[in-house]
Design a protein with these regions (language model features):
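Cofactor-binding beta-sheet edge motifs in enzyme active sites
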Residues: 1-222, 229, 239-445
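Short, basic alpha-helical nucleic acid-contact segments in DNA-binding proteins
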Residues: 226, 230-234
Length: 445
């Protein structure tokens, strides 16, 4: 289970005065809640207003509308606002744990360790209804490797259990465990170093994945090389803590990709030199600050001058849920487009103030400057204070529908000891290597 500390909670108010249903909820996607409630209760989306609240932990477990429709119906019947908050046992019973499964992986390799063919059959437990993340499991199984011949089969298995749900790259750990175990078996049988074996077969730019997509520039090779260069890889294993313990070292690689979706961002320039940034992205993991940083970079102003806020479903254009490592990407892109829009309007406004052609004005590093007269300079704060008397407010907008997937790779080395008498395991040392791409906010990574 996702194990978030904060349980689901929602309040609904179905007003007879304006026939409007208002929902306050802690969900990873308030537009998703609006659409699901609309479908379940058979009412138009225009009559539903969802106000996002802080959600705490989510990890994929707060995507689906669980209690919001129930609160809405009770509010309609009672004529009063209704709040439902789950206790811990209810969270575990009804919100959807991750899928268990069975994965069978087989790899064919030459005596030199080159992978030439592989198969993978994945069986994931969907629970009471179809819909396990079988596509994820199949698509990521051999994603770190360049194998010319692949056959993958996925089985979405319905069982007499609670419905399963998303949990941090759902399906991926299941298939990765099986594949990496098979790679280790080949390494031992051929007496080839496990990292060198993976590097020999590493996916790179131009490699075709199992789903037919072709990798652009990726970091699998760089990740493997970083392992080879690290002292953890070259140093000897520590001694066991006592005679009943045996020590060992494990090495494994993995892959995950972000999803995509629609996003909307609106920016309003305020007279005191700040910007109100309105987004439809629920903040999970620091989304607001990462969006503000990407916006601020375009204008060359300090991110602390950006005041991001998450709007309700009536106040911003459709924005898909904050899931699948997508929020900073799609909403950051929308913020970038919004900042470009504002930048263009600032240059237009300054050209009118200075009475010069717009193409002679450029806004960068937090100020407007003239390309033809070095004496003409105006700071963002000064320009902001003149908006009312020079043409009115400046508002920018960014709308995107992000497509594509940027694959990310990882490697992990763990030293551990196990008590051969009791089975107790102690982790002695763990080093993770992350193909993080561009860290927008490094301290959050």
């Amino acid at each position: 289970h996702q194990g978030y500390i904060e349980p689901q909670s929602a309040t609904a108010l179905w007003s007879e005065d304006d026939s409007k249903l208002k929902i306050w909820c802690s969900n990873q996607g308030h537009f998703s809640v609006r659409n699901e409630v609309s479908a379940l209760l058979d009412i138009p989306v225009s009559t539903i207003k969802v106000i996002p609240m802080e959600i705490g932990g989510g990890f994929g477990g707060k995507i689906t509308a669980h209690i919001e429709p129930v609160a809405a119906i009770l509010s309609k019947k009672s004529g009063r606002p209704v709040k439902i908050s789950l206790d811990r046992s209810e969270v575990l019973q009804c919100t959807g744990p991750t899928s268990g499964g069975i994965v069978k992986a087989k790899i064919g390799a030459t005596n030199e360790g080159k992978f030439i063919a592989a198969t993978c059959n994945v069986y994931l437990d969907a629970g009471a209804y179809p819909g396990s993340f079988i596509e994820n499991a199949c698509n990521t199984a051999y994603a770190p490797y360049d194998i010319p011949n692949l056959q993958l089969k996925g089985y979405d298995v319905v069982t007499n259990k609670p419905k399963t749900g998303a949990y941090r790259a759902p399906g991926t750990p299941n298939s990765a465990l099986a594949v990496e175990t098979a790679v280790d078996e080949i390494s031992k049988k051929l007496k080839i170093d496990p990292v060198h074996l993976r590097l020999k077969n590493a996916a790179d730019k131009g490699t075709r994945k199992a789903d037919g997509t072709i990798y652009p520039e990726i970091g699998m090779v760089a990740t493997a090389n970083s392992v080879l260069e690290h002292q953890h890889y070259s140093e000897s294993l520590p001694e066991p803590s006592n005679k009943s313990f045996k020590v060992g070292r494990g090495i494994a690689f993995g892959y995950s990709g972000n999803i995509n979706g629609a996003a909307t961002v609106i920016g309003n320039v305020v007279e005191d030199g700040t910007i109100t940034l309105i987004t439809g992205a629920v903040d999970i993991g620091g989304t607001r600050i990462s969006i503000a940083q990407q916006f601020a970079e375009v204008l060359g102003i300090d991110p602390t001058l950006i005041n991001p806020t998450v709007a309700d479903t009536d106040s911003i254009g459709y924005t898909s849920a904050s899931v699948g490592s997508s929020a900073s990407h799609k909403n950051g892109w929308a913020a970038y487009q919004c900042a470009l829009d504002i930048k263009d309007q600032l240059e237009e406004r300054v050209s009118k103030i200075w009475d010069v052609p717009k193409d002679t004005v450029i806004f960068k590093d937090g100020r407007a400057i003239s390309k033809t007269d070095s004496k003409l300079i105006m700071s963002f704060k000064e320009l902001s204070s003149l908006l009312d008397e020079t043409g009115g407010p400046i508002t920018g907008r960014g709308n995107v529908d992000a497509r594509g997937c940027a694959g990310s790779f990882s490697a992990n080395i763990v030293d551990l000891e196990i008590d051969i008498e009791t089975g107790k395991v102690n982790i002695l040392r763990y080093t993770a290597f992350q193909d993080a791409g561009k860290a927008i906010h490094p301290s959050y990574v």
